[in-house]
Amino acid sequence: MICPIFFLYIINVLFTQYFIKCEGNKVTVISHNNGHNDNLDVNKNGVISQENVFDTSESLNLPSNKKVGSDDLNTTTISFTVPDNLENEVKVVSSSESGKGATVSHTKVTSEGLSDTQPNVTQSVSSSTHTPGSLDSTMSTEQHSSVSQSSLPTESSSETLNKATVPEIPIQINSGLLKNYNGVKVTGSCGSYFRVYLVPHILIYALTKYSVIQLESLFNDNARIDVEHKGELQNKCSEGYHFKLVVYITHNVLNLKWKTYKPNEESKSEDSDVRKYRIPKLERPFTSIQVYTANSKAGVIETKNYNIRTDIPDTCDAIATDCFLNGNVNIEKCFQCTLLVQKKDKSHECFKYVSSEMKKKMNEIKVKAQDDFNPNEYKLIESIDNILSKIYKKANKPFEISKDLINLEDLDYQFKNELLEYCKLLKKVDTSGTLEEYELGNAEDIYNNLTRLLKSHSDENIVTLQGKLRNTAICIKNVDEWILNKRGLTLPSESPSESSSKSDSYLNTFNDKDKNEDKDDMSKNSKEEFKNDDKENSDDQNNNDSNKKDDENNINNGDTNYVYDFDDDDYDNNSYEKDMYESPIKENKNGVIDLEKYGNQIKLKSPYFKNSKYCNYEYCNRWRDKTSCISQIEVEEQGNCGLCWIFASKLHFETIRCMRGYGHFRSSALYVANCSKRKPIDRCEEGSNPLEFLRILDEKKFLPLESNYPYSYTSAGNSCPKLPNSWTNLWGDTKLLFNKKVHRYIGNKGFISHETSYFKNNMDLFIDMVKREVQNKGSVIIYIKTQDVIGYDFNGKGVHSMCGDRTPDHAANIIGYGNYINKKGEKRSYWLIRNSWSYYWGDEGNFRVDMLGPKNCLYNFIHTVVFFKLDLGTIHVPKKKSWKKNVYFLRHNPDFMYSLYYNNYEPETSQDFESENDYDNAFVHGQSNESDETNKEGKNVHNSVEKKIQILHILKHIKDSQIKRGLVKYDNINETKDEHTCSRVNSQDAEKYEECKKFCLTKWNECKDHYSPGYCLTDLYKGEDCNFCYV
């Protein structure tokens, strides 16, 4: 049957963003990213991925005579790729451009095998032709209908989609919903990596290259279990094999069936490996199943959401679905923003599904973010925007395209005055006092400093540059002087006999009483349950030091947990890992493993295996979790004073307090500085180390709040203050625990130091050790070399591969880690380092360095790692409930999409199928081959070695046999790590998208700290063409 021509006309009118052709039983859907006409790229690596969508009947938990995984319906959907160079792109046109000429690939829908009662499958696309906050329209297409092609362009058109034959990339992953079961079947070729998310309680990770399948129970502190812990899998992946994984739930039991086979020989292969896991009774039911896949060669990430149950009203579910299809990673924030933009009353039914905090702050949220700014802030923002618009030669074009800086001789009188006025405003709003100490430069000095910084950040967008122009160093006459007094580290001696300082001798002195006390402490600790939770800041503020010590009689009452430190000697024999898996996981007589009991067993075994979506073995950045205690720790500014050792030590101490449940209270750096026994004149000019930090606090038995004794580097020379009764003591009864000196580290009371030179032939062990410490204590202290390597203009956005030096001169902190792909196509890993040179230095005070650095370095960039060994005492930590009520919209960790792509990425230097033994080595630090970037000395290294990867994210929502699609294009995959990105801006008019995105970028710094940045941007925009809730 042929579709009427007028039917095509109606489609074109209603769906201006999509070009839909039906011919016989063929349906083609092409969607633009968020409604903008941005010349979506389709190159020779285009891939057509195939999906098996099964009937989703209502009899979901009942047994069926039908074979699990049998399919009723096959659909094939088109996928697009993003080439390495967007300049050489092939244009995909929307329906509004169909007259200009385009050809398309087809989507094939077959109806073979459908029962008489099976409803027609509807394919629809997330429409961008709606007003902000409106719901998506859906498009139904008869399976056997077609339209005349008379209105369609021919293949000879000058703007065809495929200008040449497009080779098909082998399909890696297919997935489909099971009929009559709550579950999915996933099939593909061995070597791929995918995830299955049973929303909202269980995540399944499948690294098929190594036949590794892991379960993560989100209801039980993210306890992760490997399916081989029950016993080795009989079905192993190898080159040329395919796999099938069936996941389904029956009667509160999660069933996994795993099978590998040669192509076309599935029926001849061995029996499947079967695993069963008992799921406890949970407040919220499973609502959907999501399958995450990636094709690194095609530059595509795909997310499929199979709806199995809706537990919220249709109106609210439609808003949440709209947020999902536009790529939002924090559905709840997008959901709240939409309600605000739509001006829904608090009595609306959807407000039952937002946080209580949002309800309380309803009126406050509707106030513009910038209303809290002082007049000088307004003027400074305007001045920065003016400078950025004039400093580039092509100021009339969009900012991101113009990177050619004007020459010094091009400075006119007006622009020179603008630069001088900018520095005066910066001096007024700066609280560090830097510009009070240094001489301000003239217009030429400011221009030279500014252009030097901009050249180091040539690839950054306007959001980043607006922040960089708040770095006070730009206004200093002799800018290289800015860093001179910021370095202040001297290495401690290794033993009392070699000690040249009183602090070293003091902390190396101990007696039998010390050892006995430490031994007793450790013995007691081994009998208690470890609980290293990040405690939310709102609860933390109710804690004070009076509740550090509770009645010993309450320890085993079952209602509380007590937090202790643990023995770091475990590293010497790796017992922290051996103890975890020394015996197989026990199952009941029916072969079922209880997930809740397993999670409790893990927590009792070791504190190191406290998993978190913001900090696990592959990725860690707790500052991304804005509800955590650690995220409340601010970036410090040490000023023109060499007290880096104090700031690195106090951050480490504060993260330990957070990890032990004490909450975050900012401690006074000035108190430590002024209670030093050194001469006042030497405190800023001569360096020291964390040993002195511990000595001072152990002697004084006191550490006040920052608000009690505020820091100013100009005051770092006063006498040690007298202690008013009103001051809070953060040190309390803290004890320094002794750790004996062994072959590869220095042990002092409360202090352990590892030098990387001792691990030169075993960096895997060093990396593993540091990761565990960061997981357990929140951070570690590091010694690094900064002279001739790091300056005021250092770009912290990328990853740097740098050598170290024999003698470090600066102390900082490792606060996280992760993986990346370098410009050579190698898989690498990085450390996330926090400095104390202000929020506007680096990347919001941080920077990233490659873990191993270049080849043939004499010294690693991390010279030494230090961590404290303290007994903070016992504290009362209420047990967490297994699930929070009214949490309807979960969010993944920021690294979720990146790690999905990373694990599917095949290094360009090695495409071979790796053996199972290779998995152990790759798992330690994620590196493929050694990098040889930069020079041996690591001098003047500013260029990032990280590869810029463009990504297309395809999102599919399958509900009631209907498929809705959304597309989001990212110019850099690192954008997927950000909670907010302007790439997700939605435009009502395709031609307005660039305008909407530019407005988002320009105004982002004004709205980023608002409770709802999307609502703030909408309020500032005033127009009706843009929807910012998806950012």
UniProtKB/Swiss-Prot annotation:
It is found in: Parasitophorous vacuole lumen; Parasitophorous vacuole membrane. Coiled coil: none annotated. Its EC number is 3.4.22.-. It holds the Pfam family Peptidase_C1. It is an enzyme of class 3 (hydrolase). Keywords: Glycoprotein, Hydrolase, Membrane, Protease, Signal, Thiol protease, Zymogen. The active site is at 644, 810, 835. Residues 91-163, 490-567 are annotated as: Disordered. InterPro entries: Papain-like_cys_pep_sf (IPR038765), Pept_cys_AS (IPR000169), Peptidase_C1A (IPR013128), Peptidase_C1A_C (IPR000668). Glycans are attached at residues 74, 120, 449, 544, 573, 674, 929, 974. GO terms for cellular component: extracellular space; lysosome; membrane; symbiont-containing vacuole; symbiont-containing vacuole membrane. The record marks 95-96, 370-371, 927-928 as: Cleavage. GO terms for molecular function: cysteine-type endopeptidase activity; cysteine-type peptidase activity. This is Serine-repeat antigen protein 6. The lineage of its organism: Eukaryota, Sar, Alveolata, Apicomplexa, Aconoidasida. The gene is SERA6.
